[in-house]
Amino acid sequence: ELSELIFSQKIHNNKRPALFFDRDGVLIKDCNYISDPDNVILEKCSKSLVRFAYNQGWIIIIVSNQSGISRKLLSWEDYSKITDKMINLFGKPNPFYGIYANSQGPKSLDKFWRKPNPNMILKAAEVFNIDLNNSILIGDRKSDILAGLQSGIKLIIHVKTGHGFEERKEVINLEKNYSEDFKFINIDNLCEFPKKFLYKIL
């Protein structure tokens, strides 16, 4: 099952790049299948980075696997409350154009929406007329990185927050298999995000 929350009706005539974020361990602390809104804590520098990108005119999208729902560890209602709390913490106006999540688990028969499949990203690109070639993906897991690569995103940023520390070696090995057409940047956390890539979009 896919949850598609669309907050912006701004569909630009010309394709624009987007900043694609994973949620848990990237934007908010990974609390191991978070189900209580009171446990929503922003990762260091996530708010300042998101607001900077928003002010620069970037489309900002969240794409996350939420297998805790299919595992019965939380409900879609819990997910909705967590989403509301997170958006509130990022301040007004809401910087997110769209938030995509799927409940498919690693053992689900249907994994169409589940990362590393790129389909949540491709869906958002269709809805918001996104230029994937010039977009950026930020994730903490190998599955995030693969989803970005398979969707055609050329700039991939891996963080060590969340599961990033334990998956960094695998991510580096993965990066070696891709051509120079792709750019990989491995950072400790969002405070190190190279803002030079977030050029102003008119």
Model-found features: residue ranges?
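Active-site phosphate/pyrophosphate-handling residues
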Residues: 3-6, 41, 48, 119, ...
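Active-site neighborhood of HAD-like aspartate-dependent phosphohydrolases
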Residues: 15-61
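Residues that scaffold the ATP/ADP-binding catalytic core of kinase and kinase-like folds
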Residues: 8, 30, 72, 196
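Conserved alpha/beta core of the MobA/IspD/sugar-nucleotide pyrophosphorylase nucleotidyltransferase superfamily
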Residues: 1-15
